[in-house]
């Protein structure tokens, strides 16, 4: 139903606008310490989060571990809203821990070529991009606007 879709989009836009002042305070300022080549613009990785690489994603998947891929950038307002409103909530973090989900975060702040290639492989030209790779089964691409319920529903094992 288009009306529901427009309603959700409008709600997301209003939430982003309400959070914009606080999010801009967290964004890197021009002239601030430049991001390093290995870990551009984002703050330190949260506990339980690792830096993204396709090799690490393959290794975790081959070991039967569920993986949540979070492709983001310091300048991406949608990414910042999703982090605050969906990914970093107590409920989402508790579910990630409960199901043993490992998060791999890719920082595209300075357009990392390896991340660009990964995005293109999945038909995307930019961030945010979210991918859940279950321990067994096909990967699931999540929408660009997240909610805690959507993330938790996606990572919850359906074979239990």
Walk through the language-model features, giving the residues of each.
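Proteins that catalyze or organize thiol-disulfide redox chemistry
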Residues: 1-100, 104-160
């Amino acid at each position: 139903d288009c009306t529901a879709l427009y309603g959700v989009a409008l709600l997301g836009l209003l939430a982003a606008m309400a959070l914009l002042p606080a999010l801009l305070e967290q964004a890197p300022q021009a002239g601030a310490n430049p991001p390093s080549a290995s870990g551009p613009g984002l703050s330190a990785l949260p506990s339980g989060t690792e830096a993204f690489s396709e090799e690490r994603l393959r290794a975790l998947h081959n070991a039967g571990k569920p993986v949540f891929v979070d492709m983001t950038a310091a300048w991406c307002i949608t990414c910042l809203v999703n982090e605050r409103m969906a990914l970093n909530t107590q409920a989402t973090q508790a579910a990630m821990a409960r199901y043993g989900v490992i998060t791999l975060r890719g920082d595209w702040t300075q357009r990392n070529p390896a991340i660009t290639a990964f995005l293109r492989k999945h038909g995307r030209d930019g961030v945010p991009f979210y991918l859940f790779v279950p321990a067994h089964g096909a990967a699931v691409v999540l929408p660009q606007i997240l909610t805690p319920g959507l993330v938790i529903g996606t990572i919850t094992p359906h074979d239990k």
